From Swiss-Prot:
SUPFAM superfamilies: YktB/PF0168-like. Coiled coil: none annotated. This is UPF0637 protein BH2637. Belongs to the UPF0637 family. It holds the Pfam family DUF1054. The lineage of its organism: Bacteria, Bacillati, Bacillota, Bacilli, Bacillales. It comes from Halalkalibacterium halodurans (strain ATCC BAA-125 / DSM 18197 / FERM 7344 / JCM 9153 / C-125).
Length: 213
C-alpha cells in the first residue's frame, strides 16, 4: 500500500494565524501522515539499531498562545518519551521537511556523547555525506551543511554541546518543500530509511555514552 507524501498545503499550515486554527490543521492534516510514516519506520529503525523503537508524534501540549512553527514524529527506545533520549525525527517546517538524529537539551548523555565525538571526529565525519546538515537548535530551521563545516567549527559545535546546558546537536537531511521527492510518499520513505541507516552510527555512539554514564 502506498504511503501519502506531503503537499504544498501541508507546509502552508504553518502560515495559519492563531494557535487553535493551526493546531486543528496539524492534527487533522499533517499528523495522520506523520503517523503513517511512523508505522512504517519504527520496525525499520528497530532492526537497524537493535533497540525496539517507539513513535512519539508531537502534541504541542504546552502551547497556550503561540502556534507551533514545526511539527514532527520522533522515534526512541522508550514508550514513555523521547526528549531525554538519543532519538530520530521526521517533521516539517513551513520551508522544508527534515530527517534528524537528535540529542536535544534535555538529554543527560549530552556531555558523554560530545566527549565520544571529540575522540575521533574525522572517523565520524567520514561517514556523513557532504549533503547532510547539522543543527544546534531543534526549535530553529537554520542548518549548516557537512561540506561547509570546518574542523574547527565542528569541534566548537561539539564542545558547546558538552559545555552549554541548552545546547543541542542534530544531524540529517532537509528537503525543500518544492522537492518532488517530498510529495512521493514511497520514494520519500526509502530516502528516510537510507538517511536513518547513515545516522545509526551516531545513535550507537550515543547509546554507548549512555552505558558509560
Amino acid at each position: 500500500m502506498s504511503i501519502p507524501g506531503f503537499v504544498q498545503a501541508d507546509f502552508d499550515v504553518f502560515t495559519i494565524d492563531g494557535l487553535e486554527p493551526r493546531m486543528e490543521k496539524i492534527k487533522n492534516q499533517i499528523r495522520p501522515k506523520l503517523e503513517a510514516f511512523g508505522t512504517e519506520l519504527a520496525p525499520t529503525l528497530s532492526s537497524l539499531t537493535g533497540d525496539e523503537m517507539f513513535v512519539h508524534t508531537a502534541k504541542h501540549a504546552r502551547r497556550t498562545v503561540n502556534p507551533p512553527n514545526d511539527t514532527w514524529a520522533a522515534f526512541a527506545n522508550s514508550k514513555r518519551g523521547y526528549k531525554k533520549l538519543p532519538h530520530f525525527q521526521v517533521g516539517l517546517w513551513e520551508s522544508h521537511l527534515f530527517v534528524w538524529f537528535a540529542i536535544i537539551y534535555e538529554s543527560p548523555v549530552k556531555g558523554a556523547f560530545a566527549e565520544e565525538l571529540l575522540k575521533a571526529p574525522t572517523a565520524i565525519r567520514e561517514n556523513i555525506p557532504d549533503s547532510f546538515k547539522w543543527s544546534v537548535d531543534h526549535t530553529k530551521p537554520d542548518t549548516v551543511s557537512e561540506s561547509e563545516l570546518s574542523d574547527d567549527a565542528f569541534t566548537k559545535m561539539v564542545e558547546r554541546l558538552r559545555d552549554v546546558k541548552k545546547a543541542e546537536l542534530l544531524c540529517g537531511i532537509t528537503l525543500d518543500r518544492k522537492d518532488p521527492l517530498v510529495q512521493d510518499g514511497d520514494k520519500l520513505l526509502h530516502t528516510i530509511e537510507d538517511t536513518f541507516k547513515t545516522l545509526v552510527p551516531l545513535y550507537q555512539l550515543a547509546q554507548q555514552s549512555t552505558v558509560q554514564m
